Each structure stands twice: as C-alpha cells, then as structure tokens.
C-alpha cells in the first residue's frame, strides 16, 4: 500500500474518500500506479464529484 504522503483525502464534509495510487480509480479508468499529481485536471472524486483542489495530502493532516 502507498505511504500516507502518497495518498490524498477528499476534504468535503460528507465524503472522506481517500485516493490511493496503488489502486487508481477503476470507475474513471485511472490505472493503478497513477500518482495524484498525474491525474487529469478534470478528474473528480468518485464519491462526491469534488475536483482535485478539494483534496489534501494525508501527511499534511494533523
């Protein structure tokens, strides 16, 4: 599994989705091994539809 600094959590109030590069995003056809930074700019959270700007790196959370 990816290290926390490689995973990103959606910061929307009702979501909490975590993007894990080891898993990718099958719903949006993002292959496993795709870093968050390499996701297309129009990629959206598969749970709530939020854009990439709504995500924060897990290691940045206190």
Swiss-Prot record:
All copies of domain Rubredoxin-like, residue ranges: 7-58
Cofactor remark: Binds 1 Fe(3+) ion per subunit.
Molecular function GO labels: electron transfer activity; ferric iron binding
Tagged with keyword Amino-acid biosynthesis: no
Listed cofactors: Fe(3+)
Aminoacyl-tRNA synthetase is among the record's keywords: no
Note: The midpoint reduction potential is 25 mV.
Protein name, entry field: Rubredoxin-2
Family statement drawn from the similarity comment of this UniProt entry: Belongs to the rubredoxin family.
